[in-house]
Amino acid sequence: NTVYTSEVLTKFMDIQPGQVLNSVYVGQKIQGINAAYARDGYMLAHVDGIRVDDQGMLHVHIVEGIVEDIIPAGNKKTRDKVITREFVQKKGKPFNKFLVRRSVERVYNLGFFDDVNVRMLPGEQDPNNVIIEIDVLEHKTGTITLGAGYSKSDGLMGIIEFGEENFRGTGDK
């Protein structure tokens, strides 16, 4: 467990040494742990199992739903690192819906995409983990301006201007 310390989780359980275990009471405490994770945005985290060892110690196994990878998809021009650098949700950390939502907003706010969506794929190392696929639909970021004019003093004159908001896919102008 990385989100909550063992001490915090022990307080959630509120079971004293020597106390007789009641399965309904333990079930309610487990629901409380799951609810706390969900409330704080860790929607993949859950109690995966409980056991009592030979010494009568209660062990609670928690799966936190770790992000194994963040994979950009649909980007033809924009480089992967331009998209992934905007992610506040990090690989190797528990999945948090609030961080993912903020990450999607940051990618969209780059101004290079018409649409940004997230797909969650099962982890390859552990099915309780997740791979985040960030699917983008790029829009045109280049502009060209042509202009012409004529004056008696200068004669015919013209202007050609090229602009690119996502130069070489790096996010540079």
Regions found by a protein language model. Give the residues of each.
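Short loop/turn motifs that connect adjacent beta-strands in outer-membrane beta-barrel proteins
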Residues: 167-173
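Periplasmic polypeptide-binding modules associated with outer-membrane biogenesis and secretion
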Residues: 1-164
